Amino acid sequence: MKNHNVEVLAPAGSYDIMKAVINAGADAVYLGGDMFGARAYAGNLNKEEMIRALDYAHLRDKKIYLTVNTLLKENECTHELVDYIAPFYEAGLDACIVQDMGVFKILHSAFPDMHMHASTQMTITGEKGASILKEMGAMRIVTARELTLDEIRQIHEKCDIEIESFVHGALCYCYSGQCLLSSMNGTRSGNRGRCAQACRLDYSVVNNDKVINDSKSSYPLSPKDMCALDILPDIIDAGVYSMKIEGRMKNVTYAAGVTSIYRKYTDMYLENGRKGYHVSQEDKNMLLDIFNRGSFTSGYYNSEKGKNMMSLSRPNHMGVKALQVVKNDNGRILFKALTDINPQDVFEIDSDNAYTSGDSYKKGSTFTVNLSRKLPLYKDRIIYRMKNGSVTKEIAEKYASQAGTLKKPVNMLFTAECGKPMKLELEACNTKVSVFGAYAEIAGKQPATVESCIKNLSKLGNTDFTAGKITADIGTNVFVPVSILNDLRRKGIEKLTETILDKYRRQTVDESVYNVCKASSKDISVTVNDSIHDGKYSTSVYLKTKGQLKSYILSGLNNDNVYADFKLFDDDECRKNIKKLADSQNVTAALPYIITQSQNRIFGSLIENIRSCNIEMFLVRNLEEIGFLGNLGQKTGFVPKIVTDAGLYCWNSFSVLQLRDIILVCGCELTRITLPYELNYKEMNMVNYGVPTEFVAEGFVPVMISKQCVRKTYGLCDHNNGIIYLNNKRSGTYMVESVCSFCHSVMYSAKRIDVGYDSSLLEEINPDYIRKDYDNMHNETAWTGHYDVGVE
């Protein structure tokens, strides 16, 4: 074993669930407050509950991490953000989990001694991105769920930063932080904590104009949940410090039940090693009962992507096989129990009807129930249990009740000697305190005994402590009133509690912390060349295919900038044409949306091909690419010029500042940034970018970047780039492109953005560059995106 210091990190959507997961064995809990969290529809905690949660956790030597993992608009990066965090910081908040680079900059500047965790929404896929975040001040990264064990191991070995990775729960189809599917179907943005779960809808899969799926496989974007119990030792040995359980939207049964299982097996491995590590089928069955989407996978750690990772027939809880219909006599149903049945088990009959068990039945036994004759309960039909009454009851009693409350043992020493003040010393959580009472007097009739004093001191009731080792040193013939003993115990516990919490608490925030909110975009203008914009727009055109490249060259068009998609550089003829084009026009190489740790060699070859065409400007889509180009530039002496794409979010001035600093530190030059798809023109105008901007005025929006591939899921993988379509009756038809060289797929919006060069929106946004796809497609589904409306 390489890593003996690990953390079980549990989710909580409410104060009560927070208590339950700590009682169930969590070392730390991540939860959201009432602002800026990526689960806007979870219960979340208000200010008072959050401070109570911090105290509850700290008295038990546990940690609380606050999610501030949404993108913030310019008008939100104000005193309001600092005001929101300040009371939690003062109360000892252990860390903030952050997505927005601007929020990261503000909070790290305002509260430098508070740990910052880089959210999985930052799409961290390799050690270069991890190193950048460490340089920014991150104490921990939450890796993308898509990384393999070997990729995580390499990050651990090459970058000295804490690693947090998911081990259980729902998997997003898209790389977290790169999904615009919900947003582009309405106004609910996943980047604002309001994901509408469009990935869990049904779609027809269309290949060569033919629908190739049916009702049994109509959820092509819905992955099964992950359960990493079987490979937990491998995950720990790969360097994962914090094992994260997904589920801030889940109930207490899920959160506490799953936490208890991962506590059990983490301890089993740390105490007994691999030889003593064995996962029982009973515990796996319990997890399936709690929630599953048709069995589990171990995620991307060691699973091959494709059909086996997907829940194609159903996107929600599938339950477990529990009953078989033996006979239906006009509504009198004879069931056979396929597993042990408990009181309050709930069984799904159809979407509108369920049956709740009133008794216990052993596996293999039969029993009769009277149900509506209209229900589709035909012979041999299998009925699934959706709720296990026994598991629900057990978890509630163990972890969600007062009896299940985790308490720290407190040791006490009581001293009473005639003529001296009575004294009570208490010790817990590496903290010692003493309190004093009245002077001890000689007993008139009944002197105090050691046993009676210990008995009274042990009565800790509903405090946060339980009696540990309690001793009493009492002189001869000493009188100790019970009232004084009770008062000493009460004062002692109060003092001990406050002393423990004082170790976590910080000084009141000084007014100077608000100065960070005044930095704004004026600081950008000082350190980045001002945009020279005279009201005329420079034009960029995006060439994706070999045919488009040939057509563009033959057209004789001359744009201010030409984007050549990275796939073009794999072709000898394309490289020759691009090199020739670069002699007369500015050509920028558009890099892949995602590169992972294991793809460095392939990416290096791509950059060599690009550089052979005399190109030094790159459209980058992630931090890993910035780090790679920076390292390459330092080795070879050239300074890569960078255009950031929309997925490197710049929603506010501070994110621009942070991104600029990253690029400069990496030894690159920030040429311009691409404006976000999800801000409207008013919100964009609030940001003084201080660097040339580019606006995507025409084209399909990449709404999902996924390690999965629809073509592979449906048995069409030929290891060649290809196109397939998904159709949803409500939202339209989406094109999904397989990108085989970097093993991911890109799903594009059903509706095409087409603002038009004469649009009043362009005048309102006033960008330096406008970008369009070179495909000349104009269709009835074109719209202006969120540039006019925005997102919630």
Name each model feature, range by range.
Residues 128:
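Short, conserved phosphate-binding/catalytic loop or strand-edge motifs used
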